């Protein structure tokens, strides 16, 4: 847990109760102290909440009846509800989760040796990356801690809590769903603290990954708040291409971004000295062998492994997916420089659950859809 206390933006529900899913362990202990209880009560309740996915105080049998009654008066455990489930032919599950009057999407990806949950951090996204479905819908708001960790809680409840099944239902969490996590640090960090906490989900810091498109000041703050694995959405070998497809690059260019990444690696143990580079393959945009040579030169001073991501289409997008032969040539160039290079296997694309396809249901405060229509650009985003 970070030494700095991170305060959620809002921890009370509409009826004035505290949602305990909004509190990390330090905050939970303060809550019980304010109730006149010993701090260890926080640990007991957290174990019920996260090890058993229990949301009923009456089922917490090692808590005395008086305290259970007091908790029911002032607190609750309320995770966001699943309103729709879609299952892919490859076993991937996508859940549409209600957050207020809107929806975000959470994706469960089971494999033989692991089960990864892709979690959203915002309703929509403000960064306008041109190849991403979420970004085309605009931005509405940040998710609360309970709405972030609640996605993990809800998924674990569905697939089977650890203490109930005897197995860990979720081995890895990736903050790669809807939104830019670094633009919601005050809620993302305490949620990740609960993921790592032994009284929470107890995940290794190497198995919780935050992905960012390059909000440099927030990345520097992250390194002082928590240690988790880092992935960066680079997607281009030079500023000219990245300015076009990842517009935040105009504010924090590649050199500035990679310098911040190296600073983070200097503070981190979770990354084992290297960052994961995410590179979406766009046909004849960033996927030529000349781009691969440029990328290798660009990353020569940044310890990393490179994930090449076949682009996943969505309606109205201006790009095409790179052919397998172009991806293969690109990969071989990078490997010739000594880079560990992996072509990511596409999962869940038949239910629009693959990388870059998450849409949810966003009330767009940025009016991006309206602006694009006024500019004559056709928008046809598939909502859940």
Curated annotation (Swiss-Prot):
Reaction catalysed by this enzyme: adenosine(2503) in 23S rRNA + 2 reduced [2Fe-2S]-[ferredoxin] + 2 S-adenosyl-L-methionine = 2-methyladenosine(2503) in 23S rRNA + 5'-deoxyadenosine + L-methionine + 2 oxidized [2Fe-2S]-[ferredoxin] + S-adenosyl-L-homocysteine; adenosine(37) in tRNA + 2 reduced [2Fe-2S]-[ferredoxin] + 2 S-adenosyl-L-methionine = 2-methyladenosine(37) in tRNA + 5'-deoxyadenosine + L-methionine + 2 oxidized [2Fe-2S]-[ferredoxin] + S-adenosyl-L-homocysteine
Example of a GO cellular component annotation carried by this entry: cytoplasm
Radical SAM core domain boundaries: 111-350
Top-tier EC class: transferase
Cofactors named for this entry: [4Fe-4S] cluster
Subcellular location: Cytoplasm
Coiled coil regions, renumbered to chain: none
Entry superkingdom: Bacteria
Keywords: 4Fe-4S, Cytoplasm, Disulfide bond, Iron, Iron-sulfur, Metal-binding, Methyltransferase, rRNA processing, S-adenosyl-L-methionine, Transferase, tRNA processing
EC annotation from Swiss-Prot or TrEMBL: 2.1.1.192
Residues that bind [4Fe-4S] cluster: 125, 129, 132
Molecular function terms, GO-annotated: 4 iron, 4 sulfur cluster binding; metal ion binding; rRNA (adenine(2503)-C2-)-methyltransferase activity; rRNA binding; tRNA (adenine(37)-C2)-methyltransferase activity; tRNA binding
Binding site for S-adenosyl-L-methionine: 179-180, 211, 233-235, 312
UniProt keyword Magnesium present: no
Disulfide bonds: 118-355
Cofactor: binding comment: Binds 1 [4Fe-4S] cluster. The cluster is coordinated with 3 cysteines and an exchangeable S-adenosyl-L-methionine.
Active-site residues, record numbering mapped to chain: 105 (proton acceptor), 355 (s-methylcysteine intermediate)
Family: Belongs to the radical SAM superfamily. RlmN family.
Additional remark text: Reaction proceeds by a ping-pong mechanism involving intermediate methylation of a conserved cysteine residue.
Protein known as: Dual-specificity RNA methyltransferase RlmN
Organism in which the protein naturally occurs: Escherichia coli O6:H1 (strain CFT073 / ATCC 700928 / UPEC)
């Amino acid at each position: 847990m970070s030494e700095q206390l991170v305060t959620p933006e809002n921890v009370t529900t509409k009826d004035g109760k505290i949602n305990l899913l909004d509190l990390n362990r330090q905050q939970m202990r303060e809550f019980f102290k304010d109730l006149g209880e010993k701090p260890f009560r926080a640990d007991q309740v957290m174990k019920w909440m996260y090890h058993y996915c229990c949301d009923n105080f009456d089922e917490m049998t090692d808590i005395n009846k008086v305290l259970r009654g007091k908790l029911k008066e002032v607190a609750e455990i309320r995770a966001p509800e699943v309103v729709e489930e879609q299952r892919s032919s490859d076993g991937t599950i996508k859940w549409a989760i209600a957050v207020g009057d809107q929806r975000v999407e959470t994706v469960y990806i089971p494999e033989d040796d692991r089960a990864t949950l892709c979690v959203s951090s915002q309703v929509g996204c403000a960064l306008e990356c041109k190849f991403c479905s979420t970004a085309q819908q605009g931005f509405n708001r940040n998710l609360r801690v309970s709405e972030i960790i609640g996605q993990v809680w809800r998924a674990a409840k569905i697939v089977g809590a650890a203490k109930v099944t005897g197995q860990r239902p979720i081995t890895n969490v990736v903050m790669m769903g809807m939104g830019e996590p670094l633009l919601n640090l005050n809620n993302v960090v305490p949620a990740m603290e609960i993921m790592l906490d032994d009284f929470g989900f107890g995940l290794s810091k190497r198995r919780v990954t935050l992905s960012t498109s390059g909000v440099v000041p927030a990345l520097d703050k992250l390194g002082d708040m928590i240690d988790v694995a880092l992935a960066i959405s680079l997607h281009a070998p030079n500023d000219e291409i990245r300015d076009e497809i990842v517009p935040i690059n105009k504010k924090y260019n590649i050199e500035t971004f990679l310098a911040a990444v190296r600073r983070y690696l200097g503070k981190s143990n979770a990354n084992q000295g290297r960052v994961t580079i995410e590179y979406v393959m766009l046909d004849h945009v960033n996927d030529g062998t000349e781009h691969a040579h440029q990328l290798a030169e660009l990353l020569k001073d940044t310890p990393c492994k490179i994930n090449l991501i076949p682009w996943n289409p969505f309606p109205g997008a201006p790009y095409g997916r790179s052919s397998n032969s172009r991806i293969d040539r690109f990969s071989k160039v990078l490997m010739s420089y000594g880079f560990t290079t992996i072509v990511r296997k596409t999962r869940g694309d038949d239910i629009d659950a693959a990388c870059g396809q998450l849409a949810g249901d966003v009330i767009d405060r940025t009016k991006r859809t309206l602006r694009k229509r006024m500019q004559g650009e056709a928008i046809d985003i598939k909502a859940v």
